[in-house]
A protein has these predicted regions:
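Bacterial N-terminal signal peptides that target proteins for export
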Residues: 2-15
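Extracellular carbohydrate-recognition regions
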Residues: 42-77, 251-262
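Short tryptophan-centered beta-strand motifs in secreted/extracellular beta-sheet-rich domains
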Residues: 61, 129-131, 191-207
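Extracellular glycan-recognition surfaces and repeat-rich motifs
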Residues: 65-102, 110-113
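Secretory/extracellular carbohydrate-interaction modules
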Residues: 105-174, 232
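Beta-strand-rich interaction surfaces with strong enrichment in secreted/lumenal proteins
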Residues: 114-121, 182-188, 228-229
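Short, aromatic/His-centered strand-loop micro-motif at the edge of beta-sheets
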Residues: 174-195
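Short, solvent-exposed beta-strand-to-loop segments that form ligand-recognition rims
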Residues: 208-228
């Protein structure tokens, strides 16, 4: 009997030891199914990338004095000046050539190109250049246009329009020689405002009249330069709201639309 009791006591001690070992090593073994609360992971807030502001340069000449060359511009050839014009798209002033100018000589009548250039030394490569233009008259010609990628007075590109021949042309001045690159017939009346625009990107040019693309053309002779305005012979050309928007500073080049039919 003593031996049996002794054996039972020994068994009880061993069992108690096993229970204590389980409690110490694995508390989960006797837990009543308690679950840990999930900790929420903070959601990362994405900061949107700001859209770059387009780089725009604009001149409306309304703060400049009539009869003088406006601030930021230089007359290369011709009597360019601010003109008070009630018909100006942005009143009261335009920039152009007044009536009553005399040509240097009759022999220079077909090769006289008055022009004015903005004085900022910035040279534009990819950009949109646009302006309001009208021709108020002229005995020999009624033309005007936008100069771009101007290197000097003998090397630049030109988008011009005029009457009475109703021409709309892209040209390049190379070493003083004006070379016609592409031309189309576009009705152009005297004393009527038109919006000329050229989009230049690399060697590709898209040319517009009143927001209608007339044609596009590829030429890569001049990579960059300044901008300006131009006239031919004794044309009384006027310009307003000259604007340059740099492509690549928040401005994308437009998708080319089908061009109007062009004459050879």
């Amino acid at each position: 009997m003593k031996t049996q009791n002794s054996w039972l006591r020994s068994a009880a001690v061993v069992a108690a030891g096993v229970v204590m070992t389980v409690l110490i090593i694995s508390p989960a073994a006797y837990s009543k199914g308690k679950k840990k609360k999930a900790v929420a992971t903070p959601t990362e807030t994405m900061t949107p990338t700001p859209t770059p502001t387009p780089e725009v340069h604009m001149w409306n000449f309304d703060q400049d004095k009539a009869g003088e060359v406006p601030a930021g511009w230089k007359a290369i050839e011709g009597d360019w000046q601010v003109i008070a014009d009630p018909s100006a798209p942005s009143k009261p002033n335009t920039f152009g050539l007044p009536a009553g100018r005399l040509l240097k000589s009759l022999t220079s009548a077909l090769e006289y190109y008055p022009m004015a250039i903005e004085t900022d030394p910035t040279e534009y490569s990819d950009f949109t250049l646009e302006a309001q233009f009208k021709s108020a008259g002229g005995r020999f010609d009624c033309s005007g246009g936008l100069i771009f990628r101007y290197v000097d007075e003998k090397n630049f590109y030109l988008l011009a329009a005029g009457c009475p021949s109703d021409y709309f042309a892209l040209s390049r001045m190379t070493d003083g020689q004006l070379i016609n690159l592409k031309q189309s017939v576009v009705p152009t009346d005297k004393d009527t405002w038109y919006r000329l625009k050229v989009v230049a990107q690399g060697g590709h040019f898209m040319c517009y009249d009143d927001d209608k693309m007339i044609f596009d053309f590829d030429d890569s002779k001049i990579a960059k330069g300044r901008v300006g305005v131009w006239a031919r012979d004794d044309s009384q050309a006027e310009f307003d709201d000259v604007k340059v928007t740099v492509i690549g500073a928040g401005e994308s080049a437009p998708t080319p639309a089908p061009a109007a039919s062009a004459s050879p």
